[in-house]
């Protein structure tokens, strides 16, 4: 199924192109911006149409099992060897990679206020602020969580990440991601995933933008198994959208930045690298609207585990143990009878970084605000504050619909280490643990 998937008309700027999409998750897609640009029945003909070059981009080893084998064939104006000159190492700003040991902050439950929108001009690369790192970028295991603050579009600048795939979670303002596979636009309550090695630039759509970014060093995000849930609900494949081909034939000086091995490098090009006229394969960027997620839950009693809200998972080598789970807490009905309905008190082998896109999170009605974040690291207790506990313990148990809310969680098997920015930026709430002070002793051996 194609959505606005007509061939894209050549423009000197991506602003001349209207995004179009193909639906499905992990499909073998094919798309061309000029008729006949895709070869038929073969991948690398002796001579490609329109004088294009054939190039394969592999996201997995050649010998990976068929179900996990990811690659795309790109038909482009110039091969990527023409997109790399002499690289020079450049400043990473506030972007950090694991392992990162910058701060001796004692272990604790942590929560941050949202960062204010800066007044100075910041492109995407300048606006990334790393909050936590986990695992090791050099062993392709773990992740990093970042905030981004963007006040200026990237102009004649492009980027790709060799260290991991990147999930954008907008909280304020829309983004236009101009990738070599096509163009993706996202707004709050949508996400986009850019695979490692894919070149792109970030443009603003309607003013400054703020949001969250997950950098996945491990296995690519995929849909979780549904098990006894069956064939439907949760995130459905048809709601994921991959862009149709769109290209620039633009001979103007451009900078290409590459994140590799935890460092940032830059080279200068005389042309835009967004020059893929056609492509086919299953390794490509995509977007997803979180509002299409179909949650399941308890319709009798008890509060189920939060894993039922998993949208995407990055598996590890241990079955059932995720490198990263991306989990959301969307609008839903709460109907469980004789049940404490908010998330229960918990100590967990996994480490949880949470953010709030909009609304109120039911376990923390105060202090956890849109654009903010919290971190509950492995084996550190957490749960509802006094206000949430009292309300849930004494309220009438009639069906209640949680509306106007969208929280999310990046959960990993690795401990998440806080960066210097996260510890010292002034956003850290030093009174977060006080939210549990009001939980008094209620035990009475004479009152069952």
Curated annotation (Swiss-Prot):
Keywords for the protein's UniProt record, in alphabetical order: Dioxygenase, Iron, Metal-binding, Oxidoreductase, Phenylalanine catabolism, Tyrosine catabolism
Record Gene3D superfamilies: Jelly Rolls
UniProt-listed GO biological process terms: L-phenylalanine catabolic process; tyrosine catabolic process
Required cofactor names: Fe cation
Pathway the protein acts in: Amino-acid degradation; L-phenylalanine degradation; acetoacetate and fumarate from L-phenylalanine: step 4/6
A cellular-component GO term for this protein: cytoplasm
GO molecular function: homogentisate 1,2-dioxygenase activity; iron ion binding
List of residues binding homogentisate: 361, 382
Catalytic activity: homogentisate + O2 = 4-maleylacetoacetate + H(+)
CDD domains: cupin_HGO_N
EC number: 1.13.11.5
Amino-acid positions noted as binding Fe cation in the UniProt annotation, renumbered to this chain: 346, 352, 382
Pfam families in UniProt: HgmA_C (PF04209), HgmA_N (PF20510)
Record: active site: 303
Family recorded in the similarity comment: Belongs to the homogentisate dioxygenase family.
Subunit note: Hexamer; dimer of trimers.
Primary role: Involved in the catabolism of homogentisate (2,5-dihydroxyphenylacetate or 2,5-OH-PhAc), a central intermediate in the degradation of phenylalanine and tyrosine. Catalyzes the oxidative ring cleavage of the aromatic ring of homogentisate to yield maleylacetoacetate.
Protein name: Homogentisate 1,2-dioxygenase
Organism whose genome encodes this protein: Rhodopseudomonas palustris (strain ATCC BAA-98 / CGA009)
